[in-house]
Amino acid sequence: MQIVVGCMPALTLKTDCLMLGVWQDRTDTPLLKELDTALHGALGQSVDSKAFVGKEGETLLFQTGAGLPAARVLLIGLGAYAQADCGAMRRGAAEGARVLQQQRVKRAGLALSEAPAGLPLTQAVQVLVEGLLLASYRFDRFLTQKREDLPPLLETLDILIADQGSLEGVAAAVERARHIGHGVALARDLVNQPGNVKSPEFLAERARQLAGECGLSCTVLEQEQLEREGFGALLAVAQGSARPPRLIVLEYRGGAPDEKPLALVGKGVVFDSGGISLKPGEKMDEMKMDMAGAAAVFGAMSAAAGLRLPVNLVAIVPAVENLPSASAYRPGDIITSLSGRTIEVLNTDAEGRLILADALTYAGRFEPRAVIDLATLTGACIIALGHEASAVFSNRDELARNLIRAGETSRERLWQLPLWDSYDKQIKSEIADMKNTGGRPAGTITAAAFLQRFVPDCPWAHIDIAGTAWEAKGTALCPRGGTGVGVRLLIDLLEQE
C-alpha cells in the first residue's frame, strides 16, 4: 500500500472514498457540518436517528454524487473523545478497511473530523494506519487462480492533515506504522506457512534473507555444530523428524558498541504433532503455528531495524519439528541439556520448554542486559486466560510492569501470573535434575518454573502466547490464522526505553 501524507482541506480531495474518523457524540464539528451541507442534510438525518453517533466500530457510507470531489464518504467511529483509546481507534480503522474492501475501493483518503483530546496527533495517525494495514493483510500465496470473491485491497492511501506544521511528524508516524505493520505481516506469514514448506531450514533461510534486507547479522548453527556444542534438549526433540534442527541467531546493533543487548528468544517448533505423546487429530493442522514465538521475534527484529531503534538486540530461535518415529525421543528418556542439567521426559508434547532451555542457556553467552522469551507453550494458558491476553512471568517486577504497560499501549495485553518457589516441587524428579512437566495443576506456571532454571543471571520475562497467537474465526484486524502477536508489544517496550 502506498501512503501519501498531505496538507489540504479533507473535502477537496478527489478520491474513490474519503474516510473521516469521528469521535462518539462529536458529530457537530466544523468539518462535519460542512460535509452535512454538501450531502444536503443526509449526515444530520443519520445522526438524529442515531444511525451513526461515532461509537467504536460504527461505519456509515455516503454516495456523494456531484456534491464532493470524493465519490464516497465513509465515516468511521473511533469511540470516546475525552479519553481517546488506541485500541478503539485501531479497530475503527480496521472496520473502515473492511467497508473499503466491500466497496472495491483502491484509493482512499483518511482524515480526522477533529484532533483527539489527550493524544498526540502523530500517535493517532500511527494507530489508524496500523489498523488499516493490519486489516489489509491477506495470506493468498498458494491460490493458483484469481478469486473473484476476494475484493481488491487498498492500493493508495492519502493522509490529510490541516496543519502544515504537523506534516513532518505525521509523515514519521506513518513510517513507524508501516514498519510495525510490515513486522506483523512477516510474523503472520511465517505462522501461516504450511508445515510441508516450513522446515527448520526454511526458518533459517528466511532469517538470512531478513538479515540481508535489514542490515542484521545472522548465524545459523546446524546439526553437527549443535551436537558438538551439546544442545542435548533441542536435539532430543528434533530426532523424530527427518528434517534437521537449526539454532538461528540474528543480531541488530543500533545502540552503543559497549551496550549489552536485549535477548529475544522465540520458540520455533515448525510443526508439533506431540511426538510419541501424540496430540488428538482434531485441530492438529493448527500446530503449524507452534513457532509463533519465533515469528514474533523475527517480526520485531525487522521492525526495530526499520525504525532504527537505538538499542542492541540479539534474537535466538531454536527451530525443530516434533514428530513420532522410530528415532523419536520417548517418555521416560533422560536427556542432558546444554546447561549440563538432566531432564526426565514424562511427555514428549512438552517439547517447547526443552528447546527453550537450551536457547536460554545459549543466550547467556551474549551477556544480555535482559532476556524475554515468547512461546506458544501451554494449553493451560488458554484455560486460564482464554484468547484475550498472554501470560507473563518475570524474575524482576520492573520488567513485568514495563511489559504490561507496553501491552496496554499496543493492545497485546498481558496478565502476570505468580512464579513462587513452591511450584518447583511439581517439576522435581527422583532420577534426574528435573522433569519436563509438573502435571495438570498450574501447568502454565510450572512450565515457566522449568524455564527459569535455565535463565542467565539477569532480568528475564517469559510470555506464553498460546491463546493469542492464532485467530480461529477472523476479526476486522486479523483474518483466520496467525495474529503476529508479540511484534507490536516488543516494539512498544523498546520505544519506552
Swiss-Prot record:
Q: Which gene encodes it?
A: pepA
Keyword presence, RNA-binding: no
- Designated name of the protein: Probable cytosol aminopeptidase
State the organism of origin.
Syntrophotalea carbinolica (strain DSM 2380 / NBRC 103641 / GraBd1) (Pelobacter carbinolicus)
Q: What is its EC number?
A: 3.4.11.1, 3.4.11.10
Organism placement in taxonomy: Bacteria, Pseudomonadati, Thermodesulfobacteriota, Desulfuromonadia, Desulfuromonadales
Keywords on this record?
Aminopeptidase, Cytoplasm, Hydrolase, Manganese, Metal-binding, Protease
Q: Which GO terms describe its cellular component?
A: cytoplasm
- What are its GO biological-process terms? proteolysis
Q: Which residues bind Mn(2+) 2?
A: K267, D272, D290, E351
